[in-house]
């Protein structure tokens, strides 16, 4: 539920930008530059915090900070394509994060209620449905082709091509964030 509710204020922000303030005046006031900066920082900081986390529930929550950073970055591009990418990501992230949290419950259930990574070893074999669901959710969050996370990242990258001076920054941060996402969703050997 929190994966959907936590984005209600972003819908409100977009509505205010388009209906109350007029998006062109928001762009000319450079408010979108602040959102872009917050988005970029959120993407990196949330991912770094998720990598350091040893508890799967908290790691997934920190991942949400990074994913909300994507949304702010998209709005901060200051283009309609960026807002469309952000809206798609809200839906994609809401669905995949819900899938992740539900599957985590199934995995911890077969691990005596423990949610640290060491206790979860083999949990996907003990609860195959939860293991498969977690795999799909993780791969989508990373941006595996054909999954909604990939479509989101593609939309952000495409929107960045029309964002002028923000294009290179957006592309670089998208690439770095994707690598960081992979580190906290797949590479957990060092935890």
Model-predicted regions and their roles:
Residues 1-188:
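Hydrophobic transmembrane alpha-helices and their helix-loop junctions in integral membrane proteins
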Residues 191:
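Conserved small/polar residues in nucleotide/adenosyl-binding loops
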């Amino acid at each position: 539920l929190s994966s959907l509710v936590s984005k209600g204020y972003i819908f409100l922000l977009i509505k205010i930008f388009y209906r109350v303030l007029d998006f062109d005046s928001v762009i000319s006031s450079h408010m979108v530059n602040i959102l872009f900066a917050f988005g970029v920082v959120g993407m990196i900081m949330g991912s770094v915090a998720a990598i350091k986390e040893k508890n799967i529930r908290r790691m997934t929550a920190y991942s949400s900070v990074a994913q909300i950073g994507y949304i702010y970055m998209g709005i901060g591009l200051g283009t309609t394509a960026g807002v469309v990418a952000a809206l798609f990501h809200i839906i994609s992230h809401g669905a995949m994060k819900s899938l992740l949290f539900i599957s985590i419950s199934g995995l911890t259930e077969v691990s005596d209620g423990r949610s640290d990574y060491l206790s979860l070893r083999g949990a996907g074999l003990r609860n195959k449905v939860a293991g498969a669901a977690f795999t799909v959710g993780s791969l989508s969050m990373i941006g595996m082709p054909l999954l909604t996370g990939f479509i989101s990242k593609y939309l952000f990258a495409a929107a960045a091509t029309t964002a002028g001076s923000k294009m290179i920054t957006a592309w670089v941060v998208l690439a770095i964030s994707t690598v960081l996402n992979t580190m906290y969703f797949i590479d957990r050997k060092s935890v």
